[in-house]
Amino acid sequence: MRTSGVVMPIFSLPSDFGIGTLGRDACDFIDFLASADVHVWEIMPICHTDSSFSPHNALCARAGNPLLIDLQPFVDQGVFSSRELSRMDWGRDRAKISYSKVAAAKYKALEMVFDALGFLSDSSFDRFREDNQDWLEDYALFAAIYEQFQYLPLPLWGDGVARRSHAELDRLRIRLDRRIRFYEYLQYLFYGQWGQLRRYAAQKGVRLMGSMTFELPETSVELWTDPAANDVSFRDAFADRWKQRLAWSRRLYDITKVYRRVDEEEVFAFYEPTWVTADDFCETLLQIGRASAGDLAAAGRYTHAFQKGFGERAAARHLPHWYDRTAIAYVGTCSDDTIRGWIKTLDKATAQDVNEYIGTALPRDQAWSVLRTMWLSQAAIVLSPVQDFLELGSSSRLSGFENPADNWTWRLRRGSLTNRLAQRIARMNRLFDRGGRQ
């Protein structure tokens, strides 16, 4: 296999309502990838996040993010009009997501959908609840309680709730019954739309790469129901938990990326059943889970990031001439700057090294020269954020800002992905044998 991919969070897609969704704009992005002869779309985690809105902070590893639900189908069903939606406050900045405003407006709209449709006789909703009973009930209860406690961390809920007192939970189930059903219904809507999007991607020859964090956050359903969910002490228990997570990921993605970060070191591991068995992958994850920061690089020896090949902490394995045919290589990770922004931050000596490596010192050529250098490597898959194809600067990075509130807020401007850009990417893919369905 020799192919290429684009990193683009769904939440960053263009939208008239403050945040990208699973609807028409996601399908349009798939159309763009297909026309560019790109066959992997890395979407970032799609989980229901905590109040930080970071995609790495999942309330539940299996629950989809309600903010990504497309509202157009409910306009078509007459629940509300486009004009009613446009009157809501989704935030005025077309270049950044205002999560507080988007969340308030989106949940107001989704409550209208629930009031109109959530209690109608619907065998498909009943079937969804039955098929997902192993996680859905706990998740919906947890989400309702999290809202009840005004999004405070789990340890501040009180011992009775935090330790799952039967009496306390029974009382809350009665008190929050309607809200619990609301959160169940949102998952039904989310996964209905997700299934449609995945089928569309498959039709276009685009494989979806999803990702999940190695450690689950403290305020999550998994740690609430199983405090040992992050434990790596016992091999068999660890493997059982991860096999369940991988089985779920196979229902959602074609390729799954597992991410772990310790101090300044980070590692990715990739799961696709034709590449590696679940047993072998769980063994790799166990090594990653037990590794110290200094050992992570060895555990993730097949993953590379161009930007990490330069500077004071440079590692030669990140340079494209070292990539082998099993490698999965990135321009940079989601916490790194864009190419243009990164080069501007380099000291003179390091910048000269980069320019000599990519063969140009001209700012207008640097981003595409880095991409070209990556694309001609031996790596099996090379991936770049869409921002680098667009040659955008630091303000368009996904995360790593000094102010954490600016993380995960970047939005793609509608009309940025032109036919000319698609043709340029397609030419590069064909030139370096990364085109065609894999």
What are these regions (language model features)?
Residues 1-226:
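Acidic/aromatic-lined carbohydrate-recognition and catalytic surfaces
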Residues 3-7, 40, 205-209, 213, ...:
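Structural preference for beta-strand elements that scaffold enzyme active sites
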Residues 20-32, 238-248, 367-369:
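Short, acidic/polar
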Residues 124, 263-394:
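Conserved alpha/beta catalytic core and glycan-binding cleft of carbohydrate-active enzymes
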Residues 192-203, 237-244, 251, 305-318:
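Flexible, glycine/threonine-enriched loop-and-boundary segments that flank and lead into catalytic domains
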Residues 199, 205-250, 263, 270, ...:
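Substrate-binding/active-site clefts of carbohydrate-active enzymes
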Residues 392-438:
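Structured C-terminal cap/extension of enzyme domains
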